[in-house]
A protein has these predicted regions:
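N-terminal capping segment at the start of a domain
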Residues: 36-82, 92, 301-318
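Extracytoplasmic/secreted proteins, especially bacterial periplasmic and envelope-associated proteins
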Residues: 57-67, 76, 80-91, 96, ...
Length: 400
């Protein structure tokens, strides 16, 4: 699957979003969070003191993962990664299993670590990150590097690092539902994408779908300049709760944290970015899903997710323990306050149901990039998603 993003930012001065149709694409606007059930602020604030996530400990995992070498499906590094975390997670009491699939001539292996709950009837929450690193650095400015495998410190290891650190603390949270840590494979192998998550979704039973509270994806969450955008498609209630949690932790600009501190500009949910990522497969099954992702890794660069993305510059020094801590504490707070369970699937943002079927531009086709300074806008045709013929001025970037 080709990854792509269609970003609809809050319009800068001079930039007009033109709609040339008789109907408005509801999902093109930032999600409104006001109409959804809110968390109890006093409960959230009192829970912050219980948080145990250690960003420094998580960051140590980044160097270890990259040190294994390219974690390409079927490689020795991939197998060593699974063997090591299997031993570590089993020592903590997790039930660990692997499932191998054959896709497009590629053997991929998904790894699952389940923490059994105190109850057997309250369903499961899936926390996921891809552990494979990209097989080619095709966005590297140095042409001699473009055939080399990417180190994958941020785009691979960062999400895994957060899950592994959370794994240390989940057994002590006394949750009344199961937590499944899903380390998915073959998310980022040129020319195919999200194959591990796709295989997982295709093999779920109806009962497993119905008893899954939510699917929370962590992707590219270690950038020192952390900027988490509203990723579409996704569940609006989950997004609303993430903003509430982030506000309490001081991650939302213009707000005040539970500690009375001014919020940082980390959760930027006024900007919606369309990304065909692993979470789409859960979303399309009706499982409430959210993608926690930084879509700007390094210096902004047209048609990409930043100057370090899919290059040999995706190295451990670009990843910040502080950023990992911000994301890890956000997810931990959500776990401890039950923010990710008992979500209404019908609250998915209108118009996002079939985002994965939008035709993406083939490599080599021309794309325009809106310059924020000049207000240049791009007219992109959005087809096959129940709004045939609707044209919206948007920014189009391909994740290739």
């Amino acid at each position: 699957m080709r990854h792509a993003q269609v970003r609809v930012p809050t319009a800068p001065r001079g930039l007009m979003l033109a709609v040339l149709a008789s109907m408005v694409l509801a999902s093109s606007a930032p999600v409104s969070h006001a109409s959804f059930e809110e968390l109890e602020p006093s409960v959230v604030c009192s829970t912050i003191d219980e948080l145990q996530f250690n960003g420094t400990h998580a960051n140590a995992s980044i160097s270890w993962q990259v040190g294994l070498g390219p974690r390409i499906p079927g490689s020795n590094a991939s197998a060593e990664f699974r063997a090591t975390i299997t031993a570590d997670l089993e020592s903590l009491g997790y039930e660990v299993s692997n499932k191998t699939h054959e896709r497009y001539g590629m053997e991929l292996t998904n790894l699952f670590a389940r923490w059994p709950s105190d109850s057997t009837s309250n369903g499961q929450l899936v926390l996921s990150a891809h552990y494979d690193s990209r097989n080619v650095a095709d966005q590297d400015e140095n042409e001699s590097n473009q055939s080399l495998p990417v180190p994958g410190a941020n785009d691979a290891a960062s999400g895994v690092a957060v899950l592994l650190e959370l794994a240390r603390h989940i057994p002590h949270m006394n949750l009344d539902y199961d937590v499944v840590l899903f380390f998915n494979d073959a998310e980022d192998q040129q020319p195919k994408y999200t194959l591990g998550a796709e295989a997982w979704a295709e093999n779920l039973t109806g009962d497993e779908i119905n008893t899954t509270h939510a699917f929370v994806l962590l992707d590219m969450v270690g950038d020192a300049d952390l900027q988490l955008h509203d990723i579409a498609p996704g569940n609006a209630t989950l997004k609303s709760r993430v903003v509430e949690l982030g506000t309490s932790l001081g991650l939302v600009n213009g707000t005040t944290s539970c500690n009375g501190e001014a919020g940082l500009d980390v959760l930027q949910y006024e900007t919606t970015v369309y990304v065909l990522d692993d979470h789409v497969h859960a979303h399309n099954l009706g499982i409430p899903a959210i993608d926690l992702m930084d879509t700007s890794f390094g210096v902004p660069k047209p048609y990409t997710f930043g100057s370090y993305w899919h290059t040999m510059e995706d190295t451990p020094d670009k990843v910040s323990a502080q950023s990992l801590a911000k994301v890890g504490r956000l997810v931990e707070l959500g776990l401890r306050t039950d923010a990710f369970v008992n979500i209404n699937p019908s609250s998915d943002t209108t118009g996002e149901e079939d985002t994965s079927s939008v035709e993406q531009p083939e490599e080599g086709e021309s794309e325009a990039y809106p310059n924020q300074n000049t207000g240049l806008a791009v007219m992109a045709s959005v087809g096959l998603v129940s709004i045939l013929g609707l044209l919206v001025v948007v920014e189009v970037r391909g994740k290739r």
